[in-house]
Regions:
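Hydrophobic single-pass membrane-targeting/anchoring helices
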Residues: 203-259
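Generic serine detector
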Residues: 17-20, 55, 73, 82, ...
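Membrane-proximal extracellular "stem/stalk" segments
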Residues: 62-218
Length: 259
C-alpha cells in the first residue's frame, strides 16, 4: 500500500493548535444501526445517535468517513443490566478508533457495575496531513482523510455477573467542521481513493457496509513522515478476542502502528 507524495512540499511541522476541549456528546433521537462483524463488513455511519445491542465477548465494527479538516468525536454508552444482579467487571466496555490504514488512533475503556456506563474517546484533532509531524499518537493518527473505523467491544467477563445479555448500546458520533481541500497528492494511492471521502461514502452513512469499498485492505502504516509513504499489506483475517486485554495485545502484535 502506498500513499503518494505531494505535488508541492509544505511546512514539515504539526499544526500548533486545535480545539482539544472535551466535546459535549451528541443528543437527539437514536436510530437503529447494527454493527458489522469485521472491518470488511463494518456498518457505515455519519454524525448522529445510533442504537444497537451488544453481547458479552462481541465486537461491533463501524466505518466513519472523515474528510480533511473534520474532527471526529465518539461516545459508547452501555445500558443498565436487567434485574437485581450486582458485581463489577473491569475494562468491560472498550471503544477504539482506527484510521484508514487501521492503525489505532485512540482507545477508551470503562468498567461496568450494572449501571449505565459510557466510554468516550479523548479529543483528537481535525484531519490534517501535517499531523504526521508530531510524536503524539492520537494526533499523528489523524493524518489521513478517508474511512475511519470505530469498534465497540464488550468483555466476556460481563456475563459472569450480569448474564449473557444482549445489552443495549448507544453510540454518539459527532463530526465537526466543513470538509476542506486535501494536501494535493502527486498521484493516486494504492489501492486507489484510499485517502479521500467519496460521494458514495457520504451518501451511504447509516447503511450496513457490504465491504465493496474496503479495497481488500489489511494494511498497517510503517512510515508516516516521508514522501510516498509505504504501507505494509497484511494477509489474513483481523479478529478481536473476547477479552479487552487480549484484544489490545493482539492489536499491538498485528498492527505495530509505527506510522
Amino acid at each position: 500500500m502506498t500513499e503518494p507524495g505531494l505535488r508541492q512540499t509544505g511546512e514539515a511541522t504539526a499544526p500548533r493548535s486545535w480545539d482539544s476541549a472535551t466535546p459535549t456528546p451528541l443528543t437527539g433521537e437514536a436510530r437503529p444501526l447494527p454493527g458489522g462483524a469485521g472491518f470488511a463488513g463494518a456498518a457505515f455511519l455519519g454524525q448522529g445517535v445510533w442504537r444497537t445491542e451488544l453481547s458479552p465477548g462481541q465486537t461491533l465494527f463501524y466505518r466513519v468517513p472523515v474528510d480533511w479538516g473534520q474532527q471526529l468525536s465518539a461516545t459508547a454508552e452501555l445500558d443498565p443490566a436487567s434485574g437485581d444482579a450486582r458485581g463489577y467487571t473491569a475494562d468491560a466496555l472498550d471503544l477504539t478508533l482506527y484510521n484508514p490504514v487501521r492503525a489505532t488512533v485512540e482507545d477508551a475503556g470503562r468498567g461496568y457495575d450494572g449501571t449505565r456506563r459510557a466510554a468516550a474517546l479523548a479529543p483528537v484533532p481535525p484531519v490534517d496531513y501535517r499531523n504526521r509531524y508530531t510524536g503524539i499518537p492520537r494526533v499523528k493518527g489523524m493524518r489521513f482523510a478517508g474511512s475511519y473505523f470505530l469498534t465497540v467491544h464488550l468483555s466476556a467477563g460481563v456475563a459472569d455477573d450480569f448474564g449473557d445479555g444482549p445489552f443495549g448500546l448507544t453510540l454518539r458520533v459527532r463530526i465537526k467542521g466543513t470538509a476542506q481541500d486535501g494536501p494535493g497528492y502527486a498521484g493516486q494511492s494504492v489501492p486507489g481513493n484510499l485517502f479521500q471521502v467519496g460521494p458514495r461514502e457520504r451518501a451511504t452513512g447509516g447503511e450496513l457496509g457490504t465491504g465493496s469499498g474496503d479495497n481488500a485492505m489489511k494494511a498497517l502504516a510503517v512510515s508516516g513522515i516521508g514522501t510516498g509513504t509505504v504501507l505494509l499489506a497484511v494477509l489474513g483475517v483481523w479478529t478481536l478476542t473476547a477479552r479487552r486485554r487480549a484484544a489490545v495485545q493482539m492489536r499491538a502484535r498485528a498492527q505495530n502502528p509505527t506510522a
